[in-house]
Amino acid sequence: VNQLFSEGATIIMSNLQERLPKLAMFCRELEKVFSARVQTNIYMTPANSQGFKAHYDGHDVLVLQVEGTKEWRIYDTPVHLPLEEQAFNPHDVPIGELTDSFVLEPGDMVYVPRGLTHDAVSTDQTSLHITTGLMMRSWADVMVEAVRKMALSDAEFREGLPPGFANEGFDTSGA
């Protein structure tokens, strides 16, 4: 790990709320406020390094800079409000134009909404930040859950679709 870090790799400590009681309490309180699942990761990036290339997340993020400084860059957003299943793929989604950049210093916090393309590069010192992921439920999540509940209680919703239903020109009047 030390060798990779000295070569510029970022150390990621995932789901630390499962190991640190204070972070667990912090996450539980945020879950009450936002009615969302909340988790934390800690990122330690060596000086003048980048942990991830430009990307967007499928959930909202709060970033708290703890040590060092990090330059954040924001790009045009290619996917508006992506679902978790619409994970960023650099081959499918081109990176937009740079629209903003700023430096986070210890104690600074930034909100990064889901779908906002961004990257971050540490400056001339090691950077440590806590990322809090807010996995908010969408109307799509609620609708999928409602249809599933209907299917569990009503066999009609579990019937197979008629043969040829996906074909162009299929007559839906008899379906």
Give short role names for the model-derived ranges.
Residues K149-A175:
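Helix-loop elements that line ligand-binding/catalytic pockets
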Residues V1-D108, L116-E156:
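Active-site region of the double-stranded beta-helix
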